[in-house]
Amino acid sequence: VEEGPLKTSSDFKMQEADAYPELYQEGIGRMSKDGAITILQGRAVGGTTLINWTSSFRTPEPTLQHWAQVYGVKGHSAEDMAPWFEKMEQRLHVAPWALPPNANNDVIRLGCEKLGYHWKVIPRNVLGCWNLGYCGMGCPVNAKQSMLVTTIPATLDKGGELLYLARANRLLLDGDKVTGLECLGMDERCVAPNGRR
């Protein structure tokens, strides 16, 4: 279920003026509650994986520990999560960036080396990347291993269904069992509900 539209690689024109209103929640204007942080959240089939910049890090161990201590999250230690991280890294082809750093990033690399700081190349979820530099506007060559080109097609191949332009409002429950999902249809531009349920 996705609130936004279904877009494919042929729709990604590498134009910010088109991509931001079409692919981002609130046209890239979504903010944290206090307005201090812009939240880059996708609004199309594939969600935020469609518009992220492909950096693929494992959740840091201190973060996992914080979740356990503050929120009581169990079964998510670094050791517990390691096989799941490995599985997703394989599925999404996560590997260090294959090309040397560009000129501006090479300055950072040289600075790190002169200051004695450790650095390494960012791990990315790509396969056959052309390094066009427009990851945040949808990948026009399907190299980014977003849910649009990985998990969703795999689910559809196994008989799953895809519902888009549908805002999920609430789960329908019978006791502790989910029996359905109440959705509200969205208009073609995904700006407002169209009244369909």
Sequence positions of predicted segments:
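Conserved beta-strand-loop-beta-strand element in the redox core of flavoprotein oxidoreductases
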Residues: 170-197
